[in-house]
Design a protein with these regions (language model features):
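Pre-signature/interface helix of ABC/ABC-like ATPase nucleotide-binding domains
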Residues: 13-19, 30, 57, 61, ...
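Linker/hinge segments immediately adjacent to helix-turn-helix/homeobox DNA-binding domains
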Residues: 1-23, 39, 78-80
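Short helix-to-turn junction characteristic of helix-turn-helix DNA-binding domains
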Residues: 32-36, 75
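Recognition helix of helix-turn-helix DNA-binding domains
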Residues: 35-70
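Short, basic, alpha-helical segments at the C-terminal edge of helix-turn-helix-like DNA-binding modules
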Residues: 68-79
Length: 80
């Protein structure tokens, strides 16, 4: 297990397993957690920005965070 490197996305499957996210939620969480804005994460995944924001809201609910900065901090605390 290595530490989370700033700007480096976490494997979405790891987030799925550790946080109970779906794989799609893990993908969004990984990209936003690495510092991308939702619109940039959406573009990277080839989905609409509103879809990314909707998925991100579900990620927030499942992880107990309410802001992107809190998600970044949560992923850092998991110390992958």
């Amino acid at each position: 297990v290595s530490s989370l490197e700033p700007g480096r996305p976490v494997d979405p499957a790891v987030l799925r397993d550790l946080l109970g996210l779906t794989l799609n939620e893990g993908r969004i969480a990984s990209l936003v957690g690495s510092g991308l804005q939702p619109r940039d994460a959406a573009a990277a995944l080839g989905i609409a920005e509103e879809t990314a924001r909707s998925v991100l809201k579900r990620v927030f609910a499942k992880t107990g965070v309410s802001r992107q900065a809190e998600l970044v901090a949560l992923l850092a605390r998991l110390a992958f």
